[in-house]
Amino acid sequence: MRIALGIEYDGNGYFGWQRQAEVDSVQAQLERALSIVANEPIGVFCAGRTDAGVHATGQVVHFETHAIRNEGAWTLGVNANLPDNIAVRWVKEVDDSFHARFSATARRYRYVIYNHSFRPGILRHGVSHYHGDIDADRMHQAAQALLGEQDFTSFRAVQCQSKTPFRNVHCVNVTRQGMYVIVDIAANAFLHHMVRNIVGSLLEIGLGNQPLTWMGDLLALKDRNQAAATAKPHGLYLVDVTYPEQYQLPKLALGPLFMLD
């Protein structure tokens, strides 16, 4: 049978999602826990591979198993065998047409900036700290140039392996909640480092170092070297993955938990 899971994790301390030799990863920990509960080797497929230090509240995975367990047994059993910084949020049996990556129609990320003169202590691994005077309204206005299907060469990592630089950004909003500035962006898919590269350039606009037209200018240039530095990983969360209604997957609060939805 094929099982889908919704999981959340704190990416701090992991070398990203993907299983790698000799370093710890979220995928390796999840597969280990699932294999214990299923009493057989389990391999998982995810909706989106996150980088080192990046978090998720809405990651979706699927796996194949011969084990017969109810949803409660999967949830409780796997959580009991996972580290405290990874948790299963929901479990659902799905038909064989479902694929966590290829069935997804959109991914949504939130990037959380702690905009204060002093660095955070408790949330140091859950937000990115920038101390300058950030104009969130200015960032939001500039970000609208990203909407639609466009060539995002200026915002892809040099090592990105995607065959095409084109992605379709469905929506992007930048808002302020007290000391926090949140960049909320959804697209059909994202290039390697695309969200963090976009945030890095939006910050330059929010700090007044670049004009409002800069995002559009960067898109036209199609040159990663012309854009700003990549934003830090700690503030980034994969918060939601969208699938066709036929799969009837659970929909939970987006998170992260310390933010108001």
Swiss-Prot record:
It catalyses: uridine(38/39/40) in tRNA = pseudouridine(38/39/40) in tRNA. Its EC number is 5.4.99.12. The active site is at residue 51. GO terms for molecular function: RNA binding; tRNA pseudouridine(38-40) synthase activity. It comes from the Bacteria. Disulfide bonds: none annotated. Transmembrane segments: none annotated. It is an enzyme of class 5 (isomerase). The keyword tRNA processing applies. The keyword tRNA processing applies. Signal peptide: none annotated. Keywords: Isomerase, tRNA processing. Homodimer. Belongs to the tRNA pseudouridine synthase TruA family. Formation of pseudouridine at positions 38, 39 and 40 in the anticodon stem and loop of transfer RNAs. This is tRNA pseudouridine synthase A. It comes from Shewanella baltica (strain OS223). The gene is truA.
